[in-house]
Amino acid sequence: RPDTETWLEKVIQYYRNETGLKVADLGTGSGAILVGFLYYCRDAVGVGVDISTEALKIAEENGQNLKITDRVEWRQGDYLKAFDEEDIFDGIFSNPPYIPTKDIGGLPGEVKHEPRLALDGGTDGIYFYHLLAKGAAEHLKPGGFLAVEFGIGQATDILEMFRKSAQYEDFEVIKDYGGIERALYCRKK
């Protein structure tokens, strides 16, 4: 989706010439973020995590289409719980569900067809960001990046949440093509 392209392009620019990167994508869904990153960052390897085996089948097909299968592992699991202690990354991506539960019924048709699991961000829409703010840093190398997409109007709360965790620095809120704040990029201290 174009909303995701803007911030992913920026992260790719930052890391395109790095060698030996190991990245992860939590809630990978179709794998578009991880596959796109690995396609342009030819020396990187990655792990895509999703709770849905159906989503992982699609991600695997997308990886095959762009010929990155030798550099990716698709892992079925529940978000951060899919990682072991030794899973340490140079970067973690996530475009988690960010729609408040009460708003799901009123979504436009093109979004409604997606599985509820891929949309429902809990009561306030930021359930998964709490998990990331608390737990992602233990799976990042010092200086490792975290790049997360969020919904319209969520930037302030999510930025504050990650600042308060005191585990990250170099915060950058990235806008989409329409000028809407769409993603947070930061690095582990």
Where do the PLM segments sit?
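Conserved SAM/SAH cofactor-binding pocket of Class I
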Residues: D3-I104
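C-terminal beta-strand of the catalytic ATP-binding
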Residues: Y98, R187-K189
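Short, well-ordered coil/turn elements that cap or connect secondary structure elements
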Residues: E18, C41, K67-T69, E114, ...
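Acidic-residue sensor for enzyme active/binding pockets
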Residues: E5, E110, E114, E149
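Mobile active-site "lid"/loop adjacent to the S-adenosyl-L-methionine
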Residues: Y98-F128
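Conserved Class I SAM-dependent methyltransferase catalytic core
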Residues: T123-R187
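S-adenosylmethionine
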Residues: F89-D90, G109, Q167
